[in-house]
Amino acid sequence: MANSVFWAIAVALVLGAEAYMPLDYRCGVKPKSRDNCGPPGISPDECVKKGCCFDDSDPDSIWCYTPWKFEDTICNPAEPKARVNCGYPGITSQDCDKKGCCFNDTIPNVVWCYQPIIEAVERDCSAVEPKKRVNCGPPGVSPDECIKNGCCFNSDVGGVPWCFKPEIKKELLQCAVLPKARINCGYPDITMDQCYKKGCCYDSSESDSIWCFYPDIEDVTIIE
């Protein structure tokens, strides 16, 4: 974990001071990394009621998908000069906390309200090879019942469990992404609030780069 935190600090130094992290970007899962969380044709309301995320902006990706589960916020105050701004001049500690950010005003001439690194847990169904699936439900279990129990469902392959245990990963998520490495999460003229609602990061300090982008993942640890 130490190496990943160091990497995040180094990137933050390059980014500048206008990158913001939303209060809750648990739905900011890149399209290619999404795990299905609902049947075909599920509506946004039905998807959200299931505790899932819905995003239909990419026609070739899963629209109703499993969110990240947040475990901890890492403020890492040891490198004050590497902080990435998460507020505005004069922001109070209470308002900073409401944004899901870190606040430390003990050191002058550095950002006081700054981006944390989020420790999250992800259920990864796509990483489980069919022959290595571990059964996670009774015979004939429905997709909805399977998913409600925290399991994965895929009936594309015969002779293996369709309802099976996911691979559980612990990850570090952060918005300190170099401009050239950003993956677009929005559309032209998207606002900061609209970007946050999509569960993504926003940084308008580079005019020629993507402003609304997916958070980066570092330090992946398989825990199950």
Curated annotation (Swiss-Prot):
Localization per Swiss-Prot or TrEMBL: Secreted
Record has Acetylation as a keyword: no
Gene Ontology CC: one annotated term: extracellular space
Keyword field: Disulfide bond, Glycoprotein, Growth factor, Repeat, Secreted, Signal
GO BP annotations listed: maintenance of gastrointestinal epithelium
Entry-listed glycosylation sites: N104
Keyword Transferase assigned: no
GO molecular function, one term: growth factor activity
SS bond list: C27-C53, C37-C52, C47-C64, C75-C102, C86-C101, C96-C113, C125-C152, C136-C151, C146-C163, C175-C201, C185-C200, C195-C212
Record domain P-type: where: 25-68, 73-117, 123-167, 173-216
Leader sequence segment: 1-17
Database matches in InterPro entries: P_trefoil_chordata, P_trefoil_CS, P_trefoil_dom, P_trefoil_dom_sf
Known tissue expression: Stomach mucosa.
Functional summary from the UniProt entry: May act as a growth factor.
Protein name: Putative gastrointestinal growth factor xP4
Source species: Xenopus laevis
